[in-house]
Amino acid sequence: MSKTRVYQIAEELNISNEELINKLAELDINVTDKDSVLEGEELELALEMLGEDLSQENGNVIEIDGKLTVQVLATKLDKSPSEIIMKLMKMGTMATINQEISFEIAALAAKDYGFELTVAESDDTEALEIEALMEIEEDKEEDLKPRPPVVTVMGHVDHGKTSLLDAIRKTDVISGEAGGITQHIGASEVKINGHKIVFLDTPGHEAFTSMRARGAQVTDIAILVVAADDGIMPQTVEAINHAKAAGVPLIVAINKIDKPGANPDKVKQELADQGLLVEDWGGEVIAVPVSAKKKEGIDTLLEMVLLVAEMEELRANPNKRAVGTVIEAELDKGRGPVATVLVQGGTLTVGDPIVAGVACGKVRAMINAKGKRVKTAGPSTAVEILGLSEVPQGGDQFVEVPTDKIARSVAARRQQIVRDEMLKSTQRLSLDALFSQMSEGSIKDLNIVIKADVQGSVQAVKQSLEKLSNEEVQVKVIHGGVGAVTESDILLAAASNAIIIGFNVRPVPGAESLGEKENVDIRTYTIIYKAIEDIQAAMTGMLDPEYVDEETGKAEIREIYKISGVGTVAGCYVTNGKIFRNCKVRLVRDSIIIHEGELAALKRFKDDVKEVNSGYECGMSFVNYNDIKEGDIVEAYITKEVERKL
């Protein structure tokens, strides 16, 4: 309806004329009586705002609690499911009776029936209490006690990681290896000078990437194993970058010093090239020459671990509810779900109810690093636990809770959240997504992993990209290497919220699917400048745009008219350029700007016009401004957004 009288609107909304007039006044729409006419924007505003207000006042508000399916919506609206399905089809959404639909779509459908959908607020006191229990307690200074360091050994294949761990444990596990890959994942404990050190046997990158991707930090110190006769290799560089990204202290073990071709100084030079300057070269990185085969330098290495641990002041409170991280977990045919956990605070005891991710249960048994059953495990202790309801994920936090019931409630709640998340479409971590997040200010750095066929390309691109950095946007190449894009690259990128750029290389089998699973964008190029252009485009989009005012025309006010019901109208003569109906205006009097605003109307004679050219007369009125005088100058302008360049 283009024009509608007040009494007609009152009938439509089922309220009295007087009540409608009062409500219109609240919306700054002034009408005199029931025969007053509303049209255009005023009419639309009145119907929209009053419709919403009245729906709430009349109780037409539906609360949605939990899963929202077509069946649930039909029941809430007191309509048949088939009618709701047809309604959704008209809206462009295909859904079956038991299919879950988005709240936004359901709200639009409900609005057509005169109802408003809202999400029910939970007043579940028990749920709030459970959440409070899950909060990690703040430790008091007097409760903190020194704890053993947790160490991960990293390095290139065949540089002697397992041999070094074997030498440290003084037990032979290499005979149980297959294809040079560590088969069992767990932990080892050694004592030196009365102090305990915990070694995680998990593959080095796992301790940093998958854990960090879930917000867990389990490693205190990383030992980087480099063969004295081989030097820095691609996986060594990966290990260095993983440790740097995690912010973990690094100790270098220069292994195989007993071999004829050993050259520790060459290794130190290559370390310096990677930004790791060793102590005897004036740096801060500890480097220890060792021979895992002859068990030389092992004690010195362990003493250095204790020294770094002392400098790090590693402490924890053993007298509170146990909390820690799941290192890895599996489903054992005979024992059910089995998880290796690292206790990081408190003391875990057999019989304690715990929650680990979406799993829960009472600890039925605990096995320590030596394969013996234990009843308690304090801070920096890794144990295998039995009794969980299902297999948790590596990197999940576990927390001890007061009762079994609370454990089940928390796990059930988390499972529901996981199900809800799975229903949402997962957005890939692409340049476009990064650009969007950056524009919102949620990302300050653009992290990149570079892989190429030759080292020269890696260095060239790294330097080119880092030159794009400015005070608003920082490009960080967190890893660059030669060779195909590997699963390790994907894990590093996922943990660091990075994208992967490849030059003349492709992902190895399995890496692409892992990239999709971890929502990592892998971009491959054959021309370097194209990659630089893409990154530059993403960064340029991050910069806040600049706005400039572009003057379109000027007019002089020559006459003033007072028109009843309209207000003050300026009779103008356009002296320069054009005056547009949708432009902004400045009123200038004696070279001083007295008002900035918008045009309420632009007319030629009695007709509304979109523009008036120079040399023509016109009538203007201004939004919420009437204090104009003859001789005032009207400057018309438009505001343009100017894209900034790097």
From Swiss-Prot:
<feature type="region of interest" description="G3">
    <location>
        <begin position="201"/>
        <end position="204"/>
    </location>
</feature>
<keyword id="KW-0648">Protein biosynthesis</keyword>
<dbReference type="InterPro" id="IPR023115">
    <property type="entry name" value="TIF_IF2_dom3"/>
</dbReference>
<comment type="similarity">
    <text>Belongs to the TRAFAC class translation factor GTPase superfamily. Classic translation factor GTPase family. IF-2 subfamily.</text>
</comment>
<keyword id="KW-0342">GTP-binding</keyword>
<dbReference type="Pfam" id="PF22042">
    <property type="entry name" value="EF-G_D2"/>
</dbReference>
<feature type="domain" description="tr-type G">
    <location>
        <begin position="146"/>
        <end position="315"/>
    </location>
</feature>
<dbReference type="InterPro" id="IPR000795">
    <property type="entry name" value="T_Tr_GTP-bd_dom"/>
</dbReference>
<feature type="region of interest" description="G4">
    <location>
        <begin position="255"/>
        <end position="258"/>
    </location>
</feature>
<feature type="binding site">
    <location>
        <begin position="155"/>
        <end position="162"/>
    </location>
    <ligand>
        <name>GTP</name>
    </ligand>
</feature>
<comment type="function">
    <text>One of the essential components for the initiation of protein synthesis. Protects formylmethionyl-tRNA from spontaneous hydrolysis and promotes its binding to the 30S ribosomal subunits. Also involved in the hydrolysis of GTP during the formation of the 70S ribosomal complex.</text>
</comment>
<dbReference type="InterPro" id="IPR027417">
    <property type="entry name" value="P-loop_NTPase"/>
</dbReference>
<feature type="binding site">
    <location>
        <begin position="201"/>
        <end position="205"/>
    </location>
    <ligand>
        <name>GTP</name>
    </ligand>
</feature>
<dbReference type="Pfam" id="PF11987">
    <property type="entry name" value="IF-2"/>
</dbReference>
<dbReference type="InterPro" id="IPR005225">
    <property type="entry name" value="Small_GTP-bd"/>
</dbReference>
<keyword id="KW-0396">Initiation factor</keyword>
<dbReference type="GO" id="GO:0005829">
    <property type="term" value="C:cytosol"/>
</dbReference>
<dbReference type="InterPro" id="IPR044145">
    <property type="entry name" value="IF2_II"/>
</dbReference>
<feature type="region of interest" description="G1">
    <location>
        <begin position="155"/>
        <end position="162"/>
    </location>
</feature>
<dbReference type="InterPro" id="IPR000178">
    <property type="entry name" value="TF_IF2_bacterial-like"/>
</dbReference>
<dbReference type="InterPro" id="IPR006847">
    <property type="entry name" value="IF2_N"/>
</dbReference>
<dbReference type="GO" id="GO:0003924">
    <property type="term" value="F:GTPase activity"/>
</dbReference>
<keyword id="KW-0547">Nucleotide-binding</keyword>
<dbReference type="GO" id="GO:0005525">
    <property type="term" value="F:GTP binding"/>
</dbReference>
<feature type="region of interest" description="G2">
    <location>
        <begin position="180"/>
        <end position="184"/>
    </location>
</feature>
<feature type="region of interest" description="G5">
    <location>
        <begin position="291"/>
        <end position="293"/>
    </location>
</feature>
<dbReference type="Pfam" id="PF00009">
    <property type="entry name" value="GTP_EFTU"/>
</dbReference>
<dbReference type="Pfam" id="PF04760">
    <property type="entry name" value="IF2_N"/>
</dbReference>
<dbReference type="InterPro" id="IPR015760">
    <property type="entry name" value="TIF_IF2"/>
</dbReference>
<feature type="binding site">
    <location>
        <begin position="255"/>
        <end position="258"/>
    </location>
    <ligand>
        <name>GTP</name>
    </ligand>
</feature>
<dbReference type="GO" id="GO:0003743">
    <property type="term" value="F:translation initiation factor activity"/>
</dbReference>
<dbReference type="InterPro" id="IPR009000">
    <property type="entry name" value="Transl_B-barrel_sf"/>
</dbReference>
<dbReference type="InterPro" id="IPR036925">
    <property type="entry name" value="TIF_IF2_dom3_sf"/>
</dbReference>
<protein>
    <recommendedName>
        <fullName>Translation initiation factor IF-2</fullName>
    </recommendedName>
</protein>
<dbReference type="InterPro" id="IPR053905">
    <property type="entry name" value="EF-G-like_DII"/>
</dbReference>
<keyword id="KW-0963">Cytoplasm</keyword>
